[in-house]
Curated annotation (Swiss-Prot):
It is an enzyme of class 3 (hydrolase). K(+) binds at residues 225, 244, 246, 249. It comes from Shewanella putrefaciens (strain CN-32 / ATCC BAA-453). This is tRNA modification GTPase MnmE. Keywords: Cytoplasm, GTP-binding, Hydrolase, Magnesium, Metal-binding, Nucleotide-binding, Potassium, tRNA processing. GO terms for biological process: tRNA methylation; tRNA wobble uridine modification. Its EC number is 3.6.-.-. Belongs to the TRAFAC class TrmE-Era-EngA-EngB-Septin-like GTPase superfamily. TrmE GTPase family. Its cofactor is K(+). NCBIfam families: mnmE_trmE_thdF, PRK05291.1-3, small_GTP. It is found in: Cytoplasm.
Length: 453
């Protein structure tokens, strides 16, 4: 861990009413004496002059001093809050750098110091960047929940449960004559099942949190001329795709990134799916399936003039059967302006079915509400925590090891192998909060932060 004293502008670059310079490290007191002529009282706002090396006043403002470890970074921290002109702030940083042993902070280094000094865990540190980058009230609320430790709490509980079960299993192994009895008495199995269930709940919440942060990838798929491109245009609010009566007009993947009440949505229009000998169209269809396989949701577009069916298994069983097992599907019966169908939503065998006219826009607003709901939008802002893709991957790894451990227990009564799978699950979960994390990962995470955070 670095022992350097670092300085950076904590407010956004440019012109503003107030500009803040932040200093963290052992030399913060030296900076106070050099720039202010005195050390401000801890946690008191001190209005004073900021002076250069010859004693001339650079600016006037508020100085705040926080004595470590009772500060954001866990070190001595000095904040100089002056006027927000960039020239003035640059002059002030230059003055601070004249004090021996001070250097400019790297992006995210203040938060990294807080993490290293156990003031934050890794999910809380990441939540700072997510709160700054939030594009909706829901994302901001969820990021704040993570910053306050809600996600960390769930992960710590899982780690503790896995660790305790692992210790119990290893204790059973220490008594080989009784190991089979320990493993078959149901106590270990019940504890393992409870952990798997809890992890599944956390995974679902994290998946929702990831969608709130990163957006939901929605693929519009169906047969040619079902109205996929018209729906893309209707959702995007502009003519993004060429629309004609000729089947197969769209031959490549088209993407639009929009926000629904601040919630990011990535919409992808794909080539119509059908058997074809056209080489270019075949490539487009292959790309369409690649997008479908990595989607968060599929909007299955159906030309309502060609069938009265609402169950997707009746409409196109081969398509539905080829979809990934856990991929959510919303059925869109298009061309309601021609069929005269009521513009309503129904549930059919577990599938949401919407009747719309992509051409006229009828029913599209209701579909947008549906998509917002899938992304976790809540008007009362009572949401969960925010999560990143790396969190989902770590949870998936942990879940995989727990399932393997379950197999070792149920099929083979193999205590040593179960203990090893529990250990691997524990490591995967601990990576989320940074308890066991490589330096390379830490560098990648904090380098994406703003300078001054």
């Amino acid at each position: 861990m670095t022992t350097d004293t670092i300085v950076a502008q904590a407010t956004a670059p440019g012109r503003g009413g107030v500009g803040i310079i932040r200093i963290s490290g052992d030399k913060a007191t030296d900076v106070a004496m050099a720039v202010l002529g005195h050390l401000p009282k801890t946690r008191y706002a001190d209005y004073c002059d900021f002076k250069n090396a010859t004693g001339q006043v650079i600016d006037q403002g508020i100085a705040l001093f926080f004595k470590g470890p009772n500060s954001f970074t866990g070190e001595d921290v000095l904040e100089l809050q002056g006027h927000g002109g960039q020239i003035v702030l640059d002059m002030l940083i230059k003055r601070v750098l004249e004090v021996e042993g001070i250097r400019i902070a790297k992006p995210g280094e203040f938060s990294e110091q807080a993490f290293m000094n156990d003031k934050l865990d890794l999910t809380q540190a990441e939540a700072i960047a997510d709160l700054i980058d939030a594009t909706s009230e829901q994302a901001a609320k969820s990021a704040l929940q993570s910053l306050q430790g809600e996600f960390s709490k769930e992960v710590h509980e899982l780690v503790d449960q896995v660790t305790n079960l692992r210790l119990y299993v290893e204790a059973a192994i220490d008594f080989p004559d009784e190991e089979v009895d320990f493993l078959s008495d149901g106590k270990i199995a019940n504890a393992l099942y409870k952990i798997i269930d809890k992890l599944s709940t956390v995974q679902a919440s994290a998946k929702q949190g990831s969608i709130i942060r990163e957006g939901m990838k929605v693929v519009i798929a169906g047969r040619p001329n079902a109205g996929k491109s018209s729906l893309l245009n209707a959702l995007a609010g502009k003519e993004s795709a060429i629309v004609t009566e000729i089947a197969g007009t769209t031959r490549d993947v088209l993407r639009e990134h929009i926000h629904l009440d601040g919630m990011p949505l990535h919409i992808i229009d794909t080539a119509g799916l059908r058997d074809t000998t056209d080489t270019v169209e075949q490539i487009g269809i292959e790309r369409a399936w690649n997008e479908i396989n990595s989607a968060d949701r599929v909007l299955f577009m159906v030309d309502g003039t060609t069938t009265d069916a609402v169950d997707p298994h009746d409409i196109w069983p081969d398509f539905i059967n080829r979809l990934p097992a856990n991929l959510g599907v919303t059925v869109i019966r298009n061309k309601a302006d021609l069929t005269g169908e009521n513009l309503d939503m129904t549930e059919e065998k577990g599938y949401s079915v919407y009747r719309i006219s992509a051409k006229t826009g009828l029913g599209v607003d209701e579909l947008k509400l549906h998509l917002k709901s899938l992304m976790g939008y809540q008007s009362n802002l009572e949401g969960g925590f925010i999560a990143r893709r790396r969190h989902l991957e770590a949870l998936d790894v942990a879940a995989s090891h727990l399932q393997l451990g379950k197999e070792q227990l149920e099929v083979y009564l193999a205590g040593e192998l179960l203990a090893e799978e529990l250990r691997m699950a524990q490591l995967a979960l601990s990576e989320i909060t940074g308890r066991f994390t490589s330096d390379d990962l830490l560098g990648k995470i904090f380098s994406s932060f703003c300078i001054g955070k």
